[in-house]
Amino acid sequence: MSKRKWRGFRGAQQERAQPPAASPQPCPAPHAGLPGGSRRRAPAPAGQQQMRAESRSGAQRRRGSARRGAHREAGGCVRGRTRSSGSERSNALWQAVDAAEALALSSPLRRPWDQAQHFTNPAPFSKGPQSAPPSPPAGRRRRGADLALTPLAGEGHTRWRQPGRPGK
């Protein structure tokens, strides 16, 4: 709806600007290609400028204090609160999540092969679940579970990550 509104508004301004140039009629004459063509070309950038300004104000409204948005738009207020309050945490969280995912993606390449060997190897099953060979994958699974849980842990993931990666 905002697009239509701005296009109509710009069209009205261009109609005012056109009469000294070519035609006093508000609608373009079919035989005059230039006024019709210019009117079609010009509102597009003008509409984009208006939309840019509108999106900026919308972004500022969302980023700004929730008090303004709470009275104007309830939905925008909720979105703005979640974005603005969680932005600081989410950036750090996403960095940690990316690091954990990189670790998780590199390490499972080893794990499925180990698990596959245990499943394909009949010896552990013949010995029973309490035998020694199945225990190492359980230890690896615990590490994998830590990898999966730490990004969700909030503060804990940073503490866990620093000793694991002393270089970074």
UniProtKB/Swiss-Prot annotation:
Residues 59-70, 159-168 have a biased composition (Basic residues). It comes from the Eukaryota. Residues 1-91, 108-168 are annotated as: Disordered. This is Putative insulin-like growth factor 2 antisense gene protein.
